[in-house]
Amino acid sequence: MPDTLNKSVAIVGGGPAGLMAAEVLSNAGVQVDVFDAMPSFGRKFLLAGIGGLNITHSEEYTKFCTRYADRQPNLQTTLDLLPPAQLCEWVHGLGIETFVGTSGRVFP
């Protein structure tokens, strides 16, 4: 295992992507500092939730992937890295409960 304990990373931006990067790096043993111009992190994510932000869809994975139409071949590898079920597990690991709406969308 590489020596990550002496490594540190500064992430500029406390939005969803910055926070996800911080979590991945921190779990790998890297010291992470997150900087944002706003006084609190994840504000856009929280505001999107007020409007009914869904995080994924509950349908069968193969069908889910077809929703990306012509872009599916380019996105498949990325989708396979974090399929909907695994995304829900990650959200639950953050202590956030989810529910499936009548449309099949998964909401926090």
Question: What are the language-model segments listed below?
Answer:
Residues 2-17, 33:
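Beta1/beta-strand and adjacent pyrophosphate-binding region of the FAD-binding site
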Residues 10, 26-50:
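Glycine-rich FAD pyrophosphate-binding loop
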Residues 18, 41, 62:
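Flexible, glycine-rich phosphate/dinucleotide-binding loops
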Residues 52-103:
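Glycine-rich active-site loop/strand segments that organize a redox cofactor
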Residues 105-108:
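P-loop NTPase switch module centered on the Walker A-proximal segment
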